[in-house]
């Protein structure tokens, strides 16, 4: 889009919101974006450069550690970025707290994206952001250790493979097991669920974190550690180091890791998540979205940047070339990626999985279930006691 067209579009947007026009007249049109990590920072660099070149509006990209915590604190003070990149599961909490602004994309704009991606960002009849991509973990395997045709389809078969590989000093599987995002999919395969899905959203008074399926899944994870199929204390950093150094055959990881493994010269495959007791693991599906700070005085510029620069085939190409985004919310760009098996598998795992509920109560779920997993895998509590406690914490 050239400067004249953008200027006209921005002018129309500002004219539609006189209060914004008045505010923006005294504000330097510098857009600030906060990202989650260095790979997200790199992803935005090219599209931001193009936007500045064509419009004259500068974009400041900041990589913030623990950005979700910093965003909450800054936005609650009326500060922080204009645009923030995060997965949709926290949007309900932030919307409820008045930290993010609802958006009103046109029906024409909405039609460009898969409907479920908008559904994930819609609460209480309002849309709280723009979808970029669909994220789900997959089973990523090192081809120098295990050929594609030999990748087990069940966790039980991974145990058998581990018995063989340990003779060579290699483990069959690892993941950051203390984090619910990676371990709850095992529990969900057996019937655990975060909150009960209803016709209008979620019943936050009905949780399956302590049901029999959750117990079966977590007991299996504990058994993997107890029987030394997974090294006790494995976290995300250890897992990635082991994978790139050839100490483990397969890991649970997401599309954000692909570029890291490519840079490490690992020849890897992306595979469907395995089963447990014949039931497929259910990834916790996130829609990566761009949200606008409720206190931003440059909402009009933010919307123009997002709709006309980021969420286009050109913008998605610029981003995905620098940071693997996984499966795409933009239909036209997903269609262009149909021959990429990694993208297709990610979408398959997303379809097998369950979207993370975007309700304010999710913060209680994350805290409670992480405590249960940590206490169970460390031996501080048995699984039944740990999940009973988690169940009560999620509901109270």
At which residue positions do the language-model features occur?
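Extracytoplasmic "Venus flytrap"/periplasmic binding protein-like
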Residues: 49-115, 122, 128, 143-153, ...
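Glycine-centered hinge/linker elements that transmit conformational signals in sensory
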Residues: 162-165, 203-233
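Conserved N-terminal structural module of periplasmic/extracytoplasmic solute-binding proteins
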Residues: 4-9, 18-93, 107, 277, ...
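Long, aromatic- and glycine/proline-rich binding clefts that accommodate carbohydrate-like moieties
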Residues: 271, 319-368
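Periplasmic solute-binding protein
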Residues: 92-99, 116-153, 177-202, 285-292, ...
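Conserved C-terminal helix/tail region of periplasmic/extracytoplasmic solute-binding proteins
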Residues: 23-26, 349-396
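Hinge/lid segment of periplasmic solute-binding proteins
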Residues: 88-137, 153, 157-160, 167, ...
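Extracytoplasmic/periplasmic substrate-recognition and gating elements
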Residues: 49, 53-54, 127, 147, ...
